[in-house]
Swiss-Prot record:
Pathway: Cofactor biosynthesis; tocopherol biosynthesis
Organism from which the protein derives: Oryza sativa subsp. japonica (Rice)
Name assigned to this protein: Probable phytol kinase 2, chloroplastic
InterPro entries membership: Phytol/farnesol_kinase
Compartment(s): Plastid, Chloroplast membrane
Transmembrane segments: 68-88, 113-133, 134-154, 170-190, 194-214, 231-251, 256-276
One Gene Ontology biological process: vitamin E biosynthetic process
Top-level enzyme category: transferase
């Protein structure tokens, strides 16, 4: 039995020994370069922060510069109008409480509104629409003067702070000319023109200081106009000139204009001429808020 089993096992075919995997021959340089070109790396997971910043950059690039400048100027116009409104409300409250006499309060409004308004011009961009958006604040005052002067809107405190007699119809003259002048200077000439500086500084600082000084130190009257004094006219010329020089330097620091001695001399000529016209009786019959800016515009067009 055992011999039969042994004979059967010997008759079975022996299994071939397992061959070890033979190492491949090294590739030639051209074949290696081709194999490397076919290989690829799996993409690494990107961080969410990097992806978010890329998305923000894409969105910012999609917004045209004109749109971003317009949004900036709209915000600047809102800030400027808000400050102007706050100043008017402040002087209205002073008029209600009787902190200053009515004439002095009116002249403080006259000086402050225009001078502070100029400070906000550098907030706006260099876009072509910027001066018109900047003119929104004084433009709103034009509408308010019309509504108050025509009796459509009532505001006794504002009328008291901006008129001589408290009559609302008075706002249709001097205060309306005042707001129109600032709107015109802003939208037409803007911050690169010395004419705009001369217009607003002589109207606001010059004319305002002339009345304050003239009422307190104006004993010596002018020979051609007993309602005006030497002190008031000299104060107007100096105040308008100094304010113009100050804003020339202010706008030069932002690169809007280039200050020079010739420009300073031009401001002096405009301020002296405006003071002479303001002292003439014709300014009393018309309105110095009309004659002073007209003079500043005409003379400024010649000297600048």
């Amino acid at each position: 039995m055992v011999s039969l089993i042994s004979a059967h096992l010997l008759s079975l075919p022996s299994s071939a020994p397992r061959s070890r995997p033979q190492s491949r021959p090294p590739l030639s340089p051209p074949a290696a370069a081709a194999a490397a070109s076919c290989s690829f790396d799996l993409p690494r997971p990107r961080r969410l922060v990097a992806d978010g910043s890329r998305r923000k950059g894409t969105m910012a690039a999609a917004i045209p510069p004109e749109a971003s400048g317009l949004a900036h100027d709209l915000g600047s116009a809102a800030v400027t109008a808000g400050v102007a409104l706050a100043l008017l409300r402040f002087f209205e409250e002073l008029a209600k409480r009787g902190v200053f006499e009515q004439k002095l309060n009116r002249k403080l409004v006259h000086i402050t509104i225009g001078m502070v308004f100029l400070l906000f011009w550098p907030l706006f961009s260099s876009g072509s629409y910027a001066p018109f958006l900047a003119a929104v604040a004084p433009g709103i005052n034009i509408i308010r003067m019309l509504l108050l002067g025509l009796g459509v809107m009532k505001n006794e405190a504002m009328v008291k702070s901006m008129s001589r007699s408290g009559d609302p119809r008075e706002l249709l003259k001097g205060p309306l000319y005042y707001a129109t002048t600032i709107t015109f200077a802003t939208s037409i000439f803007w911050r690169t023109s010395p004419i705009a500086i001369a217009l607003i500084c002589n109207l606001c600082a010059g004319d305002g200081i002339a009345d304050i000084v003239g009422r307190r130190l104006g004993q010596e009257k002018l020979p051609y106009n007993p309602n005006k004094s030497y002190a008031g006219s000299i104060a107007m010329a100096l105040a308008g000139f100094m304010a113009s020089i100050g804003y020339m330097h202010y706008f030069q620091s932002f690169g809007f204009i280039e200050e020079s001695w010739s420009l300073a001399f031009g401001f002096l000529v405009v301020s002296v001429t405006a003071a002479l016209v303001e002292s003439h009786p014709i300014s009393t019959h018309l309105d110095d808020n009309l004659t002073v800016p007209l003079t500043s515009f005409l003379v400024g067009s010649l000297v600048f």
